[in-house]
């Protein structure tokens, strides 16, 4: 089984990736590294002893999402990509809406177009 983890380089995402890899699943990560670091990918691989495929891109990037689904046979998506700072969200509500709602809608559209019906959302 191949799982796409959005926001997979963040704290919750990276820990989830380790568990998925330990369960024998293949993991593809997309993360724009706004609130994380590519170093997390190295740690995921070191802890699990397995490699991951990483795309440094925004979940709103339709072309990259299309390429991921064309390249990998994605069975399930775990969607952790999202902006979450309450104070900043009040200062930048449109940016948060675009990222959190717009990104989720693009992701769901690409999933639908590729026959992927399994998604886990994290608020």
Task: Pin down the residues of each PLM region.
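N-terminal Rossmann-like NAD(P)+-binding domain of SDR-like oxidoreductases, especially those catalyzing
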Residues: 1-123
């Amino acid at each position: 089984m191949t799982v796409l983890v959005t926001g997979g380089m963040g704290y919750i995402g990276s820990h989830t990736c380790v568990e998925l890899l330990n369960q024998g699943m293949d993991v593809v990560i997309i993360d724009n590294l706004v609130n994380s670091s590519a170093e997390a990918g190295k740690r995921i691989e070191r802890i699990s002893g397995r490699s991951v495929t990483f795309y440094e891109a925004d979940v709103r990037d339709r072309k990259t999402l299309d390429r991921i689904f064309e390249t990998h046979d994605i069975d399930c998506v775990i969607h952790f990509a999202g902006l979450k700072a309450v104070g900043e969200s009040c200062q930048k509500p449109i940016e948060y809406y675009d990222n959190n709602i717009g990104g989720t809608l693009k992701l769901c559209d690409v999933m639908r177009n590729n026959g992927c019906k399994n998604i886990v959302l994290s608020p």
